Amino acid sequence: MLFSRRLMLGLAMAGTLASALAFPARAAEGPTEIDLFFPVPVDGKLARDMGTLIKEFNDGHPDIKATAVYTGSYDDTLIKTRASIKAGKPPAAVIMSANFLLDMQIENELTNLDSLIAADGSTKEKFLGQFFPALQGNAVIDRSVYGVPFHNSTPLLYINADKAKEAGLDPSKPPQTWAELTDWAKKLTKREGDKVTQWGIAIPCAYDYCGWMMETLTMTNGGRYYNEEFGGEVYYDTPSMLGALTWWNDLVSKYKVHPPGATPGPAVSTSFISGNAAMMMLSTGSLTYVRENAKFNYKVAFIPRNVRNAVPIGGASLIIPAGVEADKQKAAWTLIKWMTSPEKSAWWSRATGYFAPNMAAYKTPDMIDFLNKNPDAKTAVEQLDVAKPWFATYKTVPVRKNLEDEVMLVLNGKKQPKEALVAAQKAADETLKPYNAETSLKLP
């Protein structure tokens, strides 16, 4: 019996060893595979830059295999992320438009990152202290961290310095006010009879960009686009927004220094690079494109003010959607911390034009050298002193489109500004009604 038991034990141990050799522990089976949703078309420089970044991460983290999945625009990425959550197969991480986080949190579609921060032995305050204060408004909801700033932007004024000099203007002293910008645009607009051969200024207006530019102009006119403390209120039918939209429309229809109609962002940047527009308002994220493609000297400057200097934050944060499995969540958190480290944040900024959200990025030797050679990259960082959170509400996209649809009608000459803003406010209030019914209007 003893022999038999020893024999059986030996066989069992041998079997266990064989199993261990044939089926090693999970860590040895292979890396944890995670997807990262990235809002960009499949082709293009941003996709290549992200591919470089992800390859470097994978090479340095053999226990994780990250794959960048290119998901189109910010709006498209939100739609695809929500569909994947609903299907029970969310990506482990998403580069999500920073102003979508509130709506996602309301819908229970985000992972609260507080516990992951605590597991690292850190605190919310210490963790967020790495990033520029202006970015925290879109990352923190109800005192909890839901997003980590990654590639962020502000709008900038781009000026063709050569054309400015030709018009007798000094590009080293860019326009500071709406009045000065209007004067510059008049002087920079060229005509041959009734035909405009060079526009003074171009401002983008297509879904997403249009709302961001309206927020920008409203802020510089002293106003607030939305209630930063509550997701159920927007301020469309106000004097500050009326003044902003009226001035934008005046550039188009009264002064005729701006292309007619609503112009998408890519068309605006192409117009500037080709010399068809002497100035443009566009994202910091376009800076590398301008730097690499402009065949002329250019200048970037703060967005001019009417009442005050102010701009909204733009760009995206890294999030972990709700429903991600524990092992993938841990891997995603490792990826997020790596991507937002000073060194990688600095690299991404140099590659793309987005400013680095991690303040320590600007103390890295490579970034110091880069800024010495490319002082134009400093402007967006300097403008952060007057930056404010990006418009974020319940149903952010529909509420934004309630305004954008009306602004496009104005710029296309089909409505007057006041009429359009009254309609936008009415539509937005209707969109926000369900949220208000369950919050501010739900009384004891």
Annotate each PLM feature:
Residues 138-150, 155, 179-233, 277:
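Extracytoplasmic/periplasmic solute-binding protein
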Residues 98-156, 210-213, 217, 299-301, ...:
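Hinge/lid segment of periplasmic solute-binding proteins
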Residues 114-131, 174, 192-194, 199-205, ...:
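Short, solvent-exposed loop/beta-turn-alpha elements that line the ligand-binding surface or hinge
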Residues 30, 165, 171, 253-256, ...:
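Conserved C-terminal helix/tail region of periplasmic/extracytoplasmic solute-binding proteins
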Residues 32, 59, 163-167, 242, ...:
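Extracytoplasmic/periplasmic substrate-recognition and gating elements
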Residues 29, 52-131, 166-168, 173-176, ...:
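Extracytoplasmic "Venus flytrap"/periplasmic binding protein-like
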Residues 182-189, 229-261:
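Glycine-centered hinge/linker elements that transmit conformational signals in sensory
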Residues 129-130, 298-301, 350-405, 409, ...:
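Long, aromatic- and glycine/proline-rich binding clefts that accommodate carbohydrate-like moieties
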